[in-house]
Structure formats: structure tokens, C-alpha cells
């Protein structure tokens, strides 16, 4: 399946092109025939089962994993800001937020101040990284990612372990950041159905691209509005899968079926 993100009419050239990407580990296929164009200002969410290749796709895009075959083409002006799923900090070596952000090469103190203010966490400047809450840590990692003023923001499962209220707040923050930077967003979601409402394209990946589409806007659902309120409904969307095939527990395609819509998580 070939997927092309929403094309920006004023910037027709993609920031990144993935062409026929295949990744194989010890005869086990991680990615198969992935084709994807990422255009300026687009917002793409990638979902799929555990072990389905989502993280491998990000690593390939970030040049952390060489594809077995295929190629990744980068535009000359692409600047990527990356928000990892988590970082490991040595608790025996305390480090403040300010010091952590200053470790990024070529960053000035004023740039750190501006980024902290933009993410509304200036009050955390002197805080110990090891003592931050999960939500605070995500904001710090997002702050670090925008220091180089990226035109593509890549986030690996930013809402993992966060309840739906926290997800809505984080999605709103990502939306605001995207608007200020005028950048594209590529995000991996751990949830198969709940995604950022602003996603222009949702891709379900299980080795290959199983299906793609747009999320349903939950603010149009009066029942959801009554249960969760306007803020959550405005920022959270629901993605309905429409697969035409099934996968075995090992991820292999086991036949086509026009009614196949199931996507199950499996152990990594």
C-alpha cells in the first residue's frame, strides 16, 4: 500500500520519502514494502500491535536502523526533533532540567529559556530530572526536541501510561507546538484506536501498512461529550480499522477477507 500524507500546496516536496522499505532481522520480517511520503505541516499517527514494526519504522527514518532494502530520501532542509518513548537516567548522578537541555550541541541559554516558556515549564528549570512526574518528563523531552526549531517532530508513544485526560492535554500541547513551529508531526501511538484528533492520516502497521484513514472526531458524538467534556473531545479522535486481511500471532498474513477489521496486540 502506498501512502501519501496530505500535500501542502505551497510546499509540494516531501520532507522525507520512504520507498519500498524492508527490514529483516535473522530471517524475521520487521517491515515489508513500506512506502510513505511525509509532507510539510502534515500530522501522521502510526498505530499497530506490539512487535508490528512501529518502532523499527521510526528507527529507520531516524537513521538508527539501516533498511535491508529500499531507501529513505531526505529533503535538504529537513530538521528533525525527536521525542523518545522514555530515557534512562542514573539516579546517582542528579541533573537539572536546564543542564539536561544544555547538553544539546550548539544551544544557547536564551534558546532554552524560550523553549521552556513555550511549553509552560519555566518553573521546572532548576528541578531535578530524576524527580519529575511522567507528564513533566514528557514536556521536558518535547522542549528538548524543539530546541533546533524542527520542521518535522517525531514522537515515539508519547501518551503511553497516560490516562485519557492526560492524553487530551498532551495532544493539545503537541497541536499548539505544531502550530507555533509550523512543522510536520509523525507520532507513534500505543493505542490501536484512540489517536490525536488533528491527525490528517492514521496508518496501521503490522509489518506492512494494513490500512490507513482519518480519525473520527469525537466532538461530534454527544454521548462522549457528556462523559468526558469538551477539552478531551476536541483533542482525541477514534480510528476505525478497515483491514482486508488477517495476521497470525507471528504477524504473517493468513488470507484476505473483506470483513477483517481486527488488529490484536501480541507480545514483543
From Swiss-Prot:
Reactions that this protein is recorded to catalyse: Zn(2+)(out) + ATP(in) + H2O(in) = Zn(2+)(in) + ADP(in) + phosphate(in) + H(+)(in)
SMART domains for the chain: AAA
Sequence similarity: Belongs to the ABC transporter superfamily. Zinc importer (TC 3.A.1.15.5) family.
PANTHER family in the record: METAL TRANSPORT SYSTEM ATP-BINDING PROTEIN TM_0124-RELATED, ZINC IMPORT ATP-BINDING PROTEIN ZNUC
Identification of the protein by name: Zinc import ATP-binding protein ZnuC
GO biological process, one term: response to zinc ion
Localization in the cell: Cell inner membrane
Domain of life (superkingdom): Bacteria
Keyword NADP included in the entry's annotation: no
Protein function: Part of the ABC transporter complex ZnuABC involved in zinc import. Responsible for energy coupling to the transport system.
Enzyme Commission identifier(s): 7.2.2.20
GO MF annotation, one: ATP binding
Coiled coil: none
Pfam families cross-referenced by the UniProt entry: ABC_tran
Topology class, membrane: Peripheral membrane protein
Major enzyme class: translocase
Residues covered by the ABC transporter domain: 16-231
InterPro entries: AAA+_ATPase, ABC_transporter-like_ATP-bd, Metal_Ion_Import_ABC, P-loop_NTPase
Originating species: Haemophilus influenzae (strain 86-028NP)
CC terms in the record's Gene Ontology section: plasma membrane
Predominant place of localization: membrane
